[in-house]
Amino acid sequence: MEKMFIQPKTWEEALEFCREQHTDLTSLLSETEMLLAHREIQEQAQTALVWTGLRFLGDRWLWVNGDPLDYQAWPPGGGHQCPARNLRCGAVGTAGPWEAHDCQEKLSFICY
């Protein structure tokens, strides 16, 4: 079961917090999971975007817990394929697609 945490944290702080709770930052593996996340963000988040477990490492995006990246919800245009150095963490908002975002920004986050 997923749980939204509204206390804004950097991506690394959010990951550490989730792992201290014996969970991880959430993976969004389907359109259904995206819709559920959008609803939860609208109802609870204190920031426009929230952190997910999506991270750009090496030359690709991956879920930090090892889930396969079969479902993808990037915006058209492909800017996520080679993100700027500071835009290497995945976030999602109330209705839109995934975003490559600055890992040092403090956002609400979802653990599962």
Describe the function of each predicted region.
Residues 1-112:
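Extracellular, disulfide-bonded carbohydrate-recognition/adhesion ectodomains
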